[in-house]
Each structure stands twice: as C-alpha cells, then as structure tokens.
C-alpha cells in the first residue's frame, strides 16, 4: 500500500457522480444493472472492497461482449467506479489504470464520466508522487471540462489549488507555475467561489516548502502581503508555517 502525502479536497465530488448510472439497454437489465445496483449500495455504505468486487466481476463477464449485448461507452461507468473504489482503498497505481481505461476505452459523450475520469487519473498520479504527470492531466482537464455536463460542475478554483500543490512538490519545484495557480485559487475564493480551507492551506504549505528549496522566500512573503487572509484560515492555521520563511 502506498502512503500519499498529497491532499485532495474534492472527495465531495464523489457524491455527485455516484448517482450517475451507466447507460445500459433494457436487455442488460438482469446483468450489468444488477452489478451496478450492488456496487452503488456498497459504495454508499463505505464498503469499498465489496463495491470493487461487484464492479470487477461485471467488467470480467460483460466487457468481452459489449458489442453483442448492445452496450455502448456508458460501460465506462464501471471503470470509473473501479477507480473510485481503488483510490478509497489507497491502491493508487491500480486506480490510475482504471481511470485511464475509462477515459481512453470509452471516450464518447455516452460515457457521462469520461472527463471526470481524466481529472481522477491526474489526481491519483499526484497521490503516487508523480506530480509532473498529475499536473499534465489536471491542466488537460481544465481545458476540456467546460464542454462536459458533469465535469463542468467541478470547482476550477479548487483544481487550480491542487495544481499548485503539484507544481510546488515537483523535483525541482516549478515555483512560478505553482504560484500562478495558487494565486488563481485564492482569487477565486475572494470572488465568492467556494474554495475549501484544506485546498488553500495545503497549497500554501507546499509553497513554503518549495520557497525554501528554491530560495523564493521573498516571493512567498509578497504573496502573503497581497493575500493576508490566507494566514487566518481554519482549522489549520497557515500562520504556524510563517516562521519557516524568516
């Protein structure tokens, strides 16, 4: 099991997509739909392994017969939920592969979760510590999400906060790109967008660490002067990290 030092605050997005069902024909009612119901019930109860088992069985049994059964790209739902379950079980490498399969094998609009799969793939690359790949996919998501009826509900400001973490945590840190995204994230909050404390706090913590590594402490001080409210975010007080800049 891989322990991740990457913090996401978009888990709430799971709630909005769990209720989206795969587009399955009536002829598949007693096949994939049964697995779907089992998986959804287990997920809502937090039984991630049980849900994963149901989704995996459906993929093994029905994916080889997608065309003959009249199934379409809506079957990507099962790969997406497989990725969700694996991520909840902290099996991030396997989650990446599941989300990648959802995005690449079922790319049409009939797969309602195709763009969300792109986001989740990037998110889980970050959890693996591959911040460059994670940032690449999150940037791609921001270019594509507005045209998608599901993904466009994601808060772009929070994605930029996560992108900031990626850039700051790269080796070496891409400090300017991190600063650009964290600034956009904080600005979105000033404009009234709901940006969670966790996103800004963890972005700022990553910024402090990157500033120390790159000698960019003065730039960080200027950021705080321009956005003083970030020093008083609860529950984690970012001010605790200010002495590290001195």
Question: Where in this protein do the model-derived segments appear?
Answer:
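Residue-level detector of the short coil/turn that links helix A to helix B
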Residues: 46, 90, 129, 171-173, ...
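Residue-level recognition of tetratricopeptide repeat
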Residues: 40, 84, 123, 165, ...
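TPR/TPR-like alpha-solenoid signature
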Residues: 36, 80, 119, 161, ...
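Residue register of alpha-helical TPR repeats
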Residues: 33, 70-73, 77, 116, ...
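Flexible helix-coil transition and linker loops at the boundaries of alpha-helical arrays
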Residues: 61-73, 104-112, 144-154, 188-197, ...
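N-terminal leader/linker segments that initiate helical-solenoid repeat arrays
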Residues: 24-77
């Amino acid at each position: 099991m891989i322990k991740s030092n990457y913090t996401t605050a978009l888990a709430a997005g799971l709630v909005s997509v769990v209720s989206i069902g795969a587009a399955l024909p009536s002829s598949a009612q007693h096949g994939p739909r049964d697995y779907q119901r089992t998986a959804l019930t287990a997920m809502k109860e937090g039984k991630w392994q049980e849900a994963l088992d149901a989704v995996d069985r459906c993929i093994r049994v029905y994916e080889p017969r997608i065309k003959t059964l009249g199934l379409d790209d809506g079957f990507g739902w099962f790969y997406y939920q497989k990725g969700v379950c694996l991520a909840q079980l902290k099996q991030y490498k396997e989650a990446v592969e599941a989300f990648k399969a959802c995005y690449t094998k079922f790319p049409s609009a009939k797969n309602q979760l195709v763009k969300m799969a792109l986001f989740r793939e990037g998110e889980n690359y970050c959890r693996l510590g591959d911040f460059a790949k994670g940032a690449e996919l999150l940037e791609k998501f921001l270019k594509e999400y507005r045209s998608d009826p599901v993904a466009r509900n994601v808060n772009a400001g929070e994605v930029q906060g996560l992108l900031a973490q990626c850039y700051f945590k790269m080796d070496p840190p891409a400090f300017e790109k991190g600063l650009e995204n964290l600034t956009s994230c904080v600005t979105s909050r000033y404009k009234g967008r709901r940006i969670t404390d966790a996103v800004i706090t963890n972005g700022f913590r990553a910024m402090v660490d990157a500033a120390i590594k790159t000698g960019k402490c003065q730039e960080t001080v200027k950021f705080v002067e321009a956005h003083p409210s970030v020093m008083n975010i609860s529950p984690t007080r970012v001010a605790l990290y200010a002495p590290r800049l001195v």
